[in-house]
């Protein structure tokens, strides 16, 4: 595991340094639906009386989960995390409608995302600048692991604060990491990010194309370094519930499948990670996923009505899984 993370989890035993098992938080991608894990984390912070960065040794995030990972670990001037989970939930309420607002020009030129991305990134960049400032990965209050994908090199790209602290060619601005992991194809244009040393530039898109649930990425990061895991808390952004009926689908071609195939692949990737993490973690995997009974499963429905519905689905998850959340709080706060 990252040396910083292992040191943070260390304790003294008989004069020797003993590394305690690592506590991991993984946050799914899901666009505006990131409001759900933000509210779950706000509840965890309320119950424990501690910031998320103080409860977990590693926070992994994809897309909107990567934005949360950066926001939760940005240091403030007092040496504590600058943002609470509740403050980040407010980001979705206030900035979400601006981020997912299509200009008339975009409506005309994108043709529903067929020939250009759906949204300009001005509002997204402004929000990330406001919430993340000039903080860099090396500054993170606890280890972060954020997914992206290099479209030129054709490889999975990982923003890792553990490497950023020891090698400036792996250090990036938090705002750039958050923007890269949020560069969902057809929604926002890709971004080029340059490391702190100015040695290399990477053209990146959303890590959700392969790791919508980054729990297994986090698992590999920890176990691959020889450390043990005490708990993996994996927060979803709401499960898709819309069925695709056989009689409707069997005659579909490329055009009809364009959006549904993204949903199906996303679900399949998340479910596969869920299975792998449950099997390999030997009872240490805690999945908190809301059923979207009323809210839209669209990544970009930031309407006032849907934001209220997302809050309602989050509140129901918290109520229905209250005992599980309490047990998790005891695990991570102990």
Functional labels for PLM-detected ranges:
Residues 2-334:
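Conserved catalytic cores and adjacent C-terminal regulatory segments
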